[in-house]
């Protein structure tokens, strides 16, 4: 199993999701799959994410002699709606696969939903440090032009290729940092709900969320420069706040009035 590389030494993580962040994400993914006897893969990406990471992942999988089917969703803007979900489900058929999501939020949500509904696992290969939803069980979808969240599953493992994350568009890096900044209000909202309406609350998880926020704000200059140190902090913070939601069983630790 690939180790969870954590910058937050005091974290109490109840969810056993192997997470790797570094320059050897694809070799680590291959090792993880070897150890887990995984040898059939459905690789889901869009044209951009396939070019920056998906093609390398496909080559590495084929080099092992494993079966891989690649689904490249093509459009200027891929949306997690019926059109793209059906494309993935048609490619998957009724066979057993390990799905691999190569992308950021939308690709991950499509893959999360489709893998869950076909009773398969999925692995996440993030391409941008833009959202905290990589570790989530929820899949925000657009159904009949209305946004809804379907309950699905977290990834079996996450392998974050640091050079790819550093090369992500700056607006996506900024979005990820904005997502982290929102935790200040989400924790305030959560505490207010606990005080006024006796909502369920967990102080340890709240502290974990705020520690992730503090670590990222302390390194804002490095994040703005898209340095490896800064982006490693940011993606780890996003993973950590996502895990806080997963561990608590609700989005309260990281989502509120913001």
Predicted regions and their residues:
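Active-site segments that bind and position negatively charged phosphate/pyrophosphate groups
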Residues: 205-258
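A glycine/threonine-rich phosphate-anchoring loop and its flanking beta-alpha core
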Residues: 116-215
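A short, small-residue-rich loop immediately preceding and capping a beta-strand
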Residues: 92-128
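Solvent-exposed alpha-helices and their adjacent loops that cap or buttress functional pockets
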Residues: 11-12, 35-36, 91-94, 115, ...
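Short beta-strand/turn micro-motifs composed of small residues
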Residues: 44-45, 103, 160
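Residues that form or flank phosphate/diphosphate-binding pockets in enzymes
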Residues: 52-53, 109, 168
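Buried hydrophobic packing segments
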Residues: 111-115, 180, 258
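ATP/NTP phosphate-donor binding region
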Residues: 1-98
């Amino acid at each position: 199993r690939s180790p969870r590389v954590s910058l937050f030494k005091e974290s109490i993580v109840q969810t056993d999701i192997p997470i790797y962040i570094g320059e050897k994400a694809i070799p680590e993914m291959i090792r993880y799959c070897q150890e887990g006897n995984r040898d059939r893969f459905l690789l889901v990406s869009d044209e951009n994410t396939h070019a920056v990471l998906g093609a390398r992942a496909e080559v590495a999988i084929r080099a092992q002699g494993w079966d891989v089917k690649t689904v490249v969703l093509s459009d200027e803007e891929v949306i997690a709606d019926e059109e793209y979900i059906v494309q993935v489900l048609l490619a998957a058929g009724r066979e057993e696969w390990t799905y691999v999501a190569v992308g950021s939020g939308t690709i991950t949500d499509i893959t999360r939903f489709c893998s869950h509904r076909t009773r398969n696992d999925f692995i996440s290969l993030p391409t941008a440090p833009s959202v905290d939803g990589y570790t989530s069980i929820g899949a925000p979808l657009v159904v009949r032009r209305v946004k809804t969240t379907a309950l699905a599953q977290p990834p079996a493992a996450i392998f974050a290729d640091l050079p790819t994350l550093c090369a992500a568009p700056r607006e996506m890096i900024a979005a990820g940092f904005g997502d982290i900044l929102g935790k200040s209000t989400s924790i305030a909202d959560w505490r207010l709900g606990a005080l006024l309406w006796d909502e369920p609350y967990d102080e340890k998880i709240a502290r974990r969320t705020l520690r992730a926020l503090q670590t990222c704000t302390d390194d804002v200059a490095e994040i703005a420069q898209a340095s490896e140190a800064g982006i490693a902090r940011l993606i780890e913070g996003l993973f950590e706040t996502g895990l806080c939601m997963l561990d608590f069983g609700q989005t309260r630790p990281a989502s509120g009035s913001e």
